[in-house]
């Protein structure tokens, strides 16, 4: 599966675990770690977040959660 897209439409339902690296998740059920760089406590993760910044997940910052 393409790591930069989500397998469901806007408002759809999907399973998004810690291994999910989609950058534009629109799933209402996807609330945690949708961005590879998004912190687990972030509640805005399902709203079109993208990872920006340096190389590697530790150097990147989530556009929604920073």
Swiss-Prot record:
Chain segments carrying region Beta: 1-30
Which example biological process does GO assign this protein?
detoxification of copper ion
Q: Name one Pfam family in it.
A: Metallothio
Which residues are involved in binding a divalent metal cation 4?
34-35, 45, 49
Residues with PTM N-acetylmethionine: 1
Binding-site list for a divalent metal cation 5 = 35, 37-38, 51
Protein name as it appears in the record? Metallothionein-3
Gene that produces this protein: MT3
